[in-house]
Amino acid sequence: CLHNWKPEWEIWNDFGLSRAAASRVDALKSTHPIECPVNHPDEAAEMFDVISYEKGCSVLYQIHEFIGGETFRRGIAAYLKKHSYGNTETHDLWDALEEACQKAAAESGKAEPEPVRLIMDKWVFTPGHPVLEVSGDKCAITFKQRPFKFLSTDDKTLWPIPVCLKARVKGKGLVEKRFLMQEAQLTMDVAKELSGDGELECLVVNAGGSGFYRVTYDKHFTSLITKDVNGNLSTIERFNLVNDAWACVRAGILSAADYLNLIQVF
């Protein structure tokens, strides 16, 4: 509502700082799920922190951007109407949003509606978040996910990641693609999925900056992005690029030298 009323305030750029704060806490071993069982009133008070608020808001914004604002609003309206003057549980909201996705898919002829409950149950009831490692060349892109932690871990948790891509293709301009990644590794054919006969000039993962996950690129895709940082990335995408890179240095995924090379282009 605030963004639609005052878009010049760029509220989601400002929220990027809050999301980054939640990501830092969520990368600790001491993190907790957004929703936890409460057996005593004192335990409820303990839940009011950056995870329940900022991460909670982040995953809602993530699904909002993935399914689309209009579909999200339809789901919220149906949820409020169905449960007015009543009590609800968490899954009631996800079911309402999923029904809205099913209706939107039927109207548009889309084969598969977004499985909102599957996505949100994982993000709400599982502590932590993933890092998406992007590598490849002009022909193929490989995405790998794993839990993001500042300290090494044997955790093999997989998330259903709502991935939003933005690609700049020679002769075609900007091409956008959204997909749900549930596998540990996924390889995408560039020509088939993005560029066609055109040359891939730049690739941005987590386009729009709404995803609650880290992204790190190999040297090939980093070089494409940094050829024109201001032209290729929005404000929040530039912030996420630097913030994710520094977090990956702290986690031992990226070297300090690579980070310094990155920030020199700004």
Across the structure, where does each feature detected by a protein language model lie?
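Edge strands and adjacent loops of beta-rich recognition modules
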Residues: 211-227
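Solvent-exposed, flexible loop/coil residues
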Residues: 38, 42, 89, 183, ...
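Glycine- and acidic
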Residues: 40-46, 76-80, 225-229, 243-244, ...
